[in-house]
């Protein structure tokens, strides 16, 4: 017996779908949060104390650790501003 249960294909005629209704295939391009970002985070690298609060609170985990500061991956950052609001030094904006 197979571990996976197979399901019958959906039958349009049995479901009563009109013949003139044509299903259309849609191509969806992958869209990252950074593609629709409204704000861009900026870090004052001289004043960053590397507390990692921005890294901890980022909902999309776009904060990247470097030797002396944290930076943001702008491809995944959605511009929500949580990092700036949570930063105790207010070094990201």
Swiss-Prot record:
Signal sequence bounds: none
The protein's required cofactors: [4Fe-4S] cluster
EC primary class: oxidoreductase
Catalytic activity: phenylglyoxylate + NAD(+) + CoA = benzoyl-CoA + CO2 + NADH
Pfam families with a match to the protein in the record: Fer4
Keywords: 4Fe-4S, Iron, Iron-sulfur, Metal-binding, NAD, Oxidoreductase, Repeat
Reported induction: Induced anaerobically by phenylalanine, phenylacetate or phenylglyoxylate.
Cofactor binding summary note: Binds 3 [4Fe-4S] clusters per heteropentamers.
InterPro entries xref list: 4Fe4S_Fe-S-bd, 4Fe4S_Fe_S_CS, PadF, PorD_KorD
Activity regulation details: Activated by magnesium ions and thiamine diphosphate.
Gene Ontology BP annotations: L-phenylalanine metabolic process
One GO MF term: phenylglyoxylate dehydrogenase (acylating) activity
Gene3D superfamilies assigned to the protein according to its UniProt record, in alphabetical order: 3.30.70.20
Activity vs pH: Optimum pH is 8 when measured with benzyl viologen. Half-maximal activities are obtained at pH 9 and pH 6.8.
EC number, UniProt record: 1.2.1.58
Domain of life: Bacteria
Span of domain 4Fe-4S ferredoxin-type: 39-68, 66-93
Summary of the function given for this chain in its UniProt record: Involved in the anaerobic metabolism of phenylalanine and phenylacetate. Catalyzes the oxidative decarboxylation of phenylglyoxylate to benzoyl-CoA and CO(2). It can also react slowly with 2-oxo-3-methylbutanoate and use different electron acceptors such as benzyl viologen, methyl viologen, FAD or FMN, but NAD seems to be the physiological electron acceptor. Also catalyzes an isotope exchange between CO(2) and the carboxyl group which proves partial or complete reversibility of the oxidative decarboxylation reaction.
Matches recorded under NCBIfam families: PhenlGlyoxDHPadF, PorD_KorD
Description of how the protein assembles with itself and partners: Dimer of heteropentamers composed of an alpha (PadG), a beta (PadI), a gamma (PadE), a delta (PadF) and an epsilon (PadH) subunit.
Protein name from the UniProt record: NADH-dependent phenylglyoxylate dehydrogenase subunit delta
Source organism: Aromatoleum evansii (Azoarcus evansii)
Gene behind this protein: padF
């Amino acid at each position: 017996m197979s571990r996976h249960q197979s399901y019958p294909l959906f039958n349009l005629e049995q479901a009563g779908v009109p013949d003139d209704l044509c299903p259309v295939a849609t191509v969806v391009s992958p869209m990252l949060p950074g593609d629709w970002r409204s704000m861009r985070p900026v870090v004052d690298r001289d004043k960053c104390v590397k507390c990692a609060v921005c890294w901890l609170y980022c909902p999309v985990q776009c904060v990247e650790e470097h030797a002396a500061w944290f930076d943001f991956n702008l491809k995944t950052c959605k511009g929500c501003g949580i990092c700036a609001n949570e930063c105790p030094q207010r070094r990201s904006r």
